[in-house]
Swiss-Prot record:
Residue runs in coiled coils: none
Residues at which [4Fe-4S] cluster 1 binds: 18, 54, 88
Described function: Catalyzes the methylthiolation of an aspartic acid residue of ribosomal protein uS12.
Designated gene of the protein: rimO
Family assignment from sequence similarity: Belongs to the methylthiotransferase family. RimO subfamily.
Domain of life of the native organism: Bacteria
The organism of origin for this protein: Chlorobaculum parvum (strain DSM 263 / NCIMB 8327) (Chlorobium vibrioforme subsp. thiosulfatophilum)
HAMAP family, sorted: MTTase_RimO (MF_01865)
UniProt entry keywords in alphabetical sequence: 4Fe-4S, Cytoplasm, Iron, Iron-sulfur, Metal-binding, S-adenosyl-L-methionine, Transferase
Catalytic activity: L-aspartate(89)-[ribosomal protein uS12]-hydrogen + (sulfur carrier)-SH + AH2 + 2 S-adenosyl-L-methionine = 3-methylsulfanyl-L-aspartate(89)-[ribosomal protein uS12]-hydrogen + (sulfur carrier)-H + 5'-deoxyadenosine + L-methionine + A + S-adenosyl-L-homocysteine + 2 H(+)
Reported cofactor(s): [4Fe-4S] cluster
Name listed for the protein in its UniProt record: Ribosomal protein uS12 methylthiotransferase RimO
Domain Radical SAM core: 135-364
Main localization (coarse): cytoplasm
Length: 437
């Protein structure tokens, strides 16, 4: 039975993909709320479904398409009135999608915020651009410091999707950060497709360290740096981590591979020697830093010997956090011109082999934390168990600290001292102590 849409003028927003997409969705939500619109977490209580898609890899594309089809189904059942789709997948396939899914009421790319708002009955206001309605827990947020990318990594379609690199001015980012602080944000995670070159286009020099210092002065409890590119990385940021208590001793720097031939084909602009020298310099400047990286296994023509070289490198480098993904042959990426020579089965086996190695490294590193007392930010509480993170763990991807809280008064979003009693490769188990001031 069709439901009366007039009685529920709410929007169901589904934000897929990365944290950069999350920020886009938060900006949109803030503008829509300022125009008097409401949002609901229950799709059956909505009159409009709005999907912010991801188009980075095949699995993400499939998820986005599946969600579109589900939304169309809700429209055909009379549960919702309109369906709109925005984001990265639309940038790549707008024509094909609109032909295949005429039931969708509007398609919008990554740079069409005013148009999306107009379609759902809201008004775009430039003065509200810095405002966001958080989709994360209220104690942490992502600060997107730039748009787009000027790198030309062969496996990546982001420059085609997001356009050229554009830094956001420092003063604008400080205003946005101040608004987030007013909302109760304690942990600020700096993100971009490439944070390493932040500021070059605006100031003619690297400005990541200047931005980090200014944000540190604002008094956030934690400031975290994510998605650094190894080429042209500004090492002075590592000095700032060591000197400023509220700048986390943590860096996410995807390396993708270590073999020189593969790195050259990937168009990374840096080889093994430069990569190893950079890692050594970072660790010498800040021995307490935790490094997270990402690798790709099964890149076109990667030989067994080249993959073994990657394994040996990871074994020696002992990264604190590491993710590995099988190479995906994406039609909008430059490497699509190469022959995808390695079977999916072999790719998955290589990923498994590398992650098994990393699991043993992570387990060994975590065992060394047993008996130590660490500062932990409590993310959530479920069934009398608290889940949190140390400064060495980014939201959603790194270690959980799991705490049986018993009769302790523990709240989400607070910092507590936790003594680690046990561990696995990706979890720490502890007991809670005092609240941090």
């Amino acid at each position: 039975m069709a439901t009366s849409n007039e009685r529920k003028p709410a929007i169901f927003l589904l934000s897929l993909g990365c944290s950069k997409n999350t920020v886009d969705s938060e900006r949109l939500t803030a503008q829509a709320v300022a125009s008097g619109l409401t949002f609901t977490d229950d799709v059956d209580e909505a009159s409009i479904i709005l999907i912010n898609t991801c188009g980075f890899i095949e699995d993400a594309k499939k998820e986005s398409i599946d969600e579109m089809l589900a939304a169309i189904g809700k429209k055909e059942e009379g549960i919702v009135r309109e369906v709109y789709v925005m984001g990265c997948l639309v940038e790549l396939y707008r024509k094909e999608l609109s032909e295949e899914m005429p039931e969708v009421d509007g398609w919008f790319g990554t740079r069409q915020l005013p148009d999306v708002l107009a379609a759902i009955g809201a008004h775009y206001c430039e003065e509200l651009y810095d405002r966001r309605e958080l989709l994360t827990p209220p104690h942490y947020a992502f600060l997107k410091i730039s748009e787009g990318c000027n790198r030309r990594c062969s496996f990546c379609s982001i420059p085609k999707i997001r356009g050229p690199y554009v830094s956001q001015p420092i003063e604008q980012l400080l205003r946005e950060a101040a608004l987030l602080q007013e909302q109760g944000v304690r942990e600020l995670n700096l993100i971009a497709q490439d944070i390493s070159v932040y500021g070059y286009d605006l100031y003619g020099k690297p400005a990541l360290n200047d931005l980090t210092l200014r944000l540190s002065d604002m008094g956030f409890d934690w400031i975290r740096l994510l998605y650094a590119y190894p080429l042209n990385f500004p090492l002075e940021v590592i000095d700032t981590m060591r000197q400023r208590r509220n700048v986390c001793n943590y860096l996410d720097m995807p390396l993708q591979h270590i073999n020189d031939r593969i790195l050259k084909s990937m168009q990374r602009g840096i080889g093994r020697k430069g990569t190893e020298e950079l890692i050594d310099a970072i660790r010498q400047k800040n021995p307490d830093i935790r490094l997270r990286t990402t690798m790709i296994a099964g890149y076109p023509s990667e030989t067994r010997e080249e993959f073994d070289e990657l394994l040996d490198f990871v074994r020696q480098a002992r990264f604190d956090r590491l993710g590995c993904f099988p190479y995906r042959h994406e039609e909008h990426a430059p490497a699509y011109a190469l022959e995808d020579t390695i079977s999916d089965k072999e790719k998955e086996e290589r990923v498994g082999e590398l992650m098994e190695l990393q699991e043993s490294i992570a387990a060994s590193l975590n065992r060394k934390l047993e008996g130590q007392t660490l500062t932990v930010l409590i993310d959530r509480i479920e069934d009398n168990v608290a889940y949190g993170r140390t400064e060495y763990d980014a939201p959603e991807v790194d270690n959980d600290v799991i705490i049986e809280i018993g009769d302790e008064a523990v709240e989400e979003g607070e910092f507590r001292q936790v003594t680690v009693e046990d561990s696995t490769a990706y979890e720490l188990f502890g007991r809670v102590g005092s609240e941090c001031s």
